UniProtKB/Swiss-Prot annotation:
The lineage of its organism: Eukaryota, Metazoa, Chordata, Craniata, Vertebrata. One of its GO terms (molecular function) is ATPase activator activity. This is the non-catalytic component of the active enzyme, which catalyzes the hydrolysis of ATP coupled with the exchange of Na(+) and K(+) ions across the plasma membrane. The beta subunit regulates, through assembly of alpha/beta heterodimers, the number of sodium pumps transported to the plasma membrane. It comes from the Eukaryota. Belongs to the X(+)/potassium ATPases subunit beta family. InterPro entries: Na/K_ATPase_sub_beta (IPR000402), Na/K_ATPase_sub_beta_sf (IPR038702). Glycans are attached at residues 159, 194, 266. The chain crosses the membrane at residues 36-63. This is Sodium/potassium-transporting ATPase subunit beta-1. Disulfide bonds join 127-150, 160-176, 214-277.
Amino acid sequence: MARGKANDGDGNWKKFIWNSEKKELLGRTGGSWFKILLFYVIFYGCLAGIFIGTIQVMLLTVSEFEPKYQDRVAPPGLTQVPQVQKTEISFTVNDPKSYDPYVKNLEGFLNKYSAGEQTDNIVFQDCGDIPTDYKERGPYNDAQGQKKVCKFKREWLENCSGLQDNTFGYKDGKPCILVKLNRIIGFKPKAPENESLPSDLAGKYNPYLIPVHCVAKRDEDADKIGMVEYYGMGGYPGFALQYYPYYGRLLQPQYLQPLVAVQFTNLTYDVEVRVECKEYGQNIQYSDKDRFQGRFDIKFDIKSS
């Protein structure tokens, strides 16, 4: 009796999967399956069409050349090269392997600043050797083609150019870092007022320059930094205004950010030294929540052996 019930159960589910009498698969005939599949193809096709149409309409309102809304964009951050984890540079003076990653990072970044990479006069423009005013190059949504960019001579970085010393001072315990301002389309940094500058910078004021200055992050490190040398355009320790505004990757794909090289020539060995570098300008802001907004700090740990 039990075996008969089991056989009936087996027959029921087999019949549900394929009913040979009614020619039904899973309770539906071939015509029914065709109709329901056709319905879902049309249904999801319409959904996809609505989605694609919405995206296309949205893209019509978005410029490919510049962001539509920039009123909430924070001023660009200040960063350094070499790019290091935990913003720490640690090496041993007489061990080339310990500072080789920093040297390679610097050399790789500076390759595009070499004279041989800036020979195309259709793209690159000589904007002078001293800071001057902004270089306006027309509208930001210009579809006429690429806009020119200012050349930046690697030689301006002097001891930190890697041309005379291919270790950028690291083999002598005098490390160099490169300071740069991140790119934001249309941003025009405004030079600071002279009276707002630290005393070390007041005598080097230039109305067309965003100066950069590095000091001890902690009071106890003030006597461990030693002399700091700055190298930039025309010997000025800052970013010249003629490199701004930036027009974006489509219009200025070979844009070169102005650089300031900072060399620490007499850091104390075998102790950790924290340094803070800041840029100064009327529209430069600082934030405790973002340690790279207008400034950054970096730790040096140079071992004598």
